[in-house]
């Protein structure tokens, strides 16, 4: 929104100077909210009349769009003269180029605002369903925790098989589902569009990214780890072929389930028997204790998921800094431990031993801004 405000100010400044000079009339007071509503109405019309608005749209298309935008619609020039935005194309070459770029960026940012408004409306509509799903999920988790045998836990999963499949299909077909779950617990997403935009950039996951990630995991070679065909794995193998994302993208559900089972087994072993992993976790916890105020957390009165998420949201900058510092101070140690595990178990991708340093550094450089 800040960027849009800057672009709007530039647009108005250039437009007012040119209009007042050409007509001898004085511009009225500026009302950004009013004018943005006009732009939000115009953008779909311009896309229908001219072409789709994209970052690569040509200058001549932008100039054509200017022809369909009358200054009379905007409050600062409301009903004063019949000038259109294209009239500013008479500026000298440098100013003209700047104005065209400003107008293009304005349209792109308004397009984003339209998308946010649409998501904002859907978030309000979908939260009731999300609340219902969340309660059911917590109920299933509670029953699983209360199960004393593997058979009892398997029965809980079987009894809720249809719900689990339908919920997974909803989650995997909606790139904003994670965002909607957060909105249930953090009301700022519903009341503040700035927060919604920030969270959208962080927590939106496209189907393409999911499919790519699933394929990468499926293609891992962890043949040294024995497959555990317990009832949980059998349940996952029966369930995954019914997931639409797997069906539509021809993903081998059995292969993915096998790899996930092996990864789970490997992680469990490392957490329970790897001395280096244990020392790393202990050092991290002890270090975090010196930076996190336990008293502050107690005073907040966190007693459920909603209050926990609200607390994290209210203090995310502080905890983001702590997590970042902790990770960066231990990155080399983490990479060494992970590479040792990879070497010991001969974990390969595309017939090559995984290089954990390359993998982690690449991930950090590409995606760390999201966290």
From Swiss-Prot:
Q: Which Pfam families match?
A: Pox_A6
The cellular location(s) given in this protein's UniProt record come to: Host cytoplasm; Virion
Which keywords annotate this record?
A: Host cytoplasm, Virion
Q: Which InterPro entries match?
A: Poxvirus_A6
GO CC terms of this entry: host cell cytoplasm; virion component
Name the family: Belongs to the orthopoxvirus OPG132 family.
Summarizing the function annotation, the protein's role is: Lipid-bound viral membrane assembly protein that plays an essential role in immature virion (IV) to mature virion (MV) transition. Functions in both crescent-shaped viral membranes formation and its enclosure to form immature virions. In addition, participates in targeting mature virion proteins to sites of virion assembly to ensure their correct localization.
About its domains, the entry says: The N-terminal domain is not required for crescent formation but is required for virion formation.
Name by which UniProt lists this protein: Virion morphogenesis protein OPG132
Per the UniProt entry, what species is this protein from, by scientific name? Vaccinia virus (strain Western Reserve)
């Amino acid at each position: 929104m800040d960027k849009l405000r800057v672009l709007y100010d530039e647009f108005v400044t250039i437009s007012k100077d040119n209009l007042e000079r050409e007509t001898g009339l004085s511009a009225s007071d500026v009302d950004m909210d009013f004018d943005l509503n006009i732009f939000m109405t115009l953008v779909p019309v311009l896309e229908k009349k001219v072409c789709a608005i994209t970052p690569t749209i040509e200058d001549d298309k932008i100039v054509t769009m200017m022809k369909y935008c009358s200054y009379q619609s905007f409050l600062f020039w409301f009903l004063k003269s019949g000038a259109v935005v294209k009239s500013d194309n008479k500026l000298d070459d440098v100013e003209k180029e700047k104005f065209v770029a400003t107008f293009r960026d304005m349209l792109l940012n308004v397009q984003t605002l339209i998308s946010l408004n649409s998501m904002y409306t859907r978030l309000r509509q979908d939260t009731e369903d999300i609340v219902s799903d969340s309660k059911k999920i917590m109920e299933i988790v509670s029953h699983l925790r209360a199960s004393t045998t593997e058979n009892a836990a398997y029965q809980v999963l079987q009894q809720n098989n249809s719900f689990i499949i339908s919920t997974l299909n909803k989650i995997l077909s909606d790139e904003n589902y994670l965002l909607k779950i957060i909105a249930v617990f953090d009301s700022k997403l519903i009341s503040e569009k700035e927060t919604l935009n920030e969270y959208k950039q962080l927590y939106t996951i496209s189907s393409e990214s999911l499919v790519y990630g699933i394929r990468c995991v499926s293609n891992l070679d962890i043949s040294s780890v024995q497959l555990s065909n317990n009832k949980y794995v059998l349940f996952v193998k029966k369930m995954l072929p019914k997931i639409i994302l797997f069906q539509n993208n021809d993903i081998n559900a059995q292969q993915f389930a096998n790899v996930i089972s092996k990864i789970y087994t490997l992680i469990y072993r490392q957490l329970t028997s790897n001395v280096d992993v244990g020392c790393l976790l202990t050092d991290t916890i002890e270090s975090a204790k010196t930076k996190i105020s336990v008293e502050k957390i107690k005073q907040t009165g966190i007693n459920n998921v909603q209050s926990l998420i609200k607390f994290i949201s209210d203090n995310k900058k502080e905890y983001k800094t702590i997590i970042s510092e902790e990770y960066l101070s231990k990155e080399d140690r983490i990479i060494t431990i992970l590479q040792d595990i990879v070497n010991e178990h001969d974990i390969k991708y595309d017939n090559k031993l995984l290089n954990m340093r390359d993998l982690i550094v690449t991930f950090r450089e590409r995606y760390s801004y999201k966290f």
